[in-house]
């Protein structure tokens, strides 16, 4: 058995807040933000997580999250699985009895992720400038417990996303999110109704992000 005192990950922050998006919106959640990301999306709101040097052992992380009265843990980034030890962290959180979700850019193979983890995966739209990094093979890995997210800045992004959904059978829930200050939420909602697609439109709740 691995010694969790010897396995480290580079962590940007661990904080307690309400989940501001996706299925668990509004639920008290501990967020574990891992450092580093291979992408540079032009609308990224967590660029502060690109770099840093704060190695923590998995034992330390488990101890930190246990201080909060919640069963919900969200592992995020950056890009969490850019760090290979993230898989062991996810396994350890599941073994500890938590309900775990992981937010990923979709640019790295998600098939090794523990099957009990709920995956929230982006597909990068053209306006992100990182469309070429999409790993489309991941679409077939997603299950009904998971979520596929499109961040939309324009009508062309939306039409591109709808075309991709037509070409792929996706088992997961589909989410559309407007880029802040680029697209009004009501406009995105109108497009979804116009296309009559089975998707959820949401915006981030204005919630605190630090404990």
Question: Which residue ranges define each predicted feature?
Answer:
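Radical SAM/AdoMet-radical enzyme domain recognition
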Residues: 85-166, 170-172
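Conserved Radical SAM active-site core
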Residues: 9, 28-29, 39-117
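Hydrophobic beta-strand scaffold residues
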Residues: 100, 199-201
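Conserved small/polar residues in nucleotide/adenosyl-binding loops
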Residues: 203-209
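C-terminal folded domains that constitute the principal catalytic or ligand-binding module
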Residues: 175-177
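Short Gly/Pro-enriched loop/turn and capping motifs at secondary-structure junctions
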Residues: 153-157, 179-184
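Catalytic cores of alpha/beta
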Residues: 186-189
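N-terminal pre-triad scaffold of radical SAM enzymes
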Residues: 7-40
């Amino acid at each position: 058995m691995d010694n969790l005192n010897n396995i480290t990950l580079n962590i940007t922050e661990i904080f307690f807040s309400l989940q501001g998006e996706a299925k668990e919106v509004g639920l008290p959640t501990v967020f574990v933000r891992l450092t580093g990301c291979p992408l540079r999306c032009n609308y990224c709101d967590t660029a502060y997580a690109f770099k840093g040097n704060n190695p923590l052992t998995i034992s330390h992380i488990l101890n930190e999250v246990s201080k909060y009265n919640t069963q919900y843990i969200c592992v995020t980034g950056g890009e969490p699985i850019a760090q290979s030890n993230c898989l062991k962290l996810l396994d350890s959180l599941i073994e500890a009895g938590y309900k775990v979700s992981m937010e990923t850019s979709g640019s790295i193979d998600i098939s090794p992720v523990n099957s009990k983890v709920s995956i929230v995966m982006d597909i990068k739209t053209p306006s992100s400038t990182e469309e070429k990094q999409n790993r489309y093979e991941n679409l077939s890995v997603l299950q009904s417990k998971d979520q596929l997210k499109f961040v939309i800045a324009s009508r062309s992004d939306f039409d591109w996303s709808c075309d991709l959904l037509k070409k792929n059978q996706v088992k997961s829930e589909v989410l559309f999110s407007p880029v802040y200050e680029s697209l009004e939420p009501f406009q995105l909602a109108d497009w979804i109704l116009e296309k009559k697609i089975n998707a959820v439109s949401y915006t981030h709740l204005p919630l605190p992000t630090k404990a």
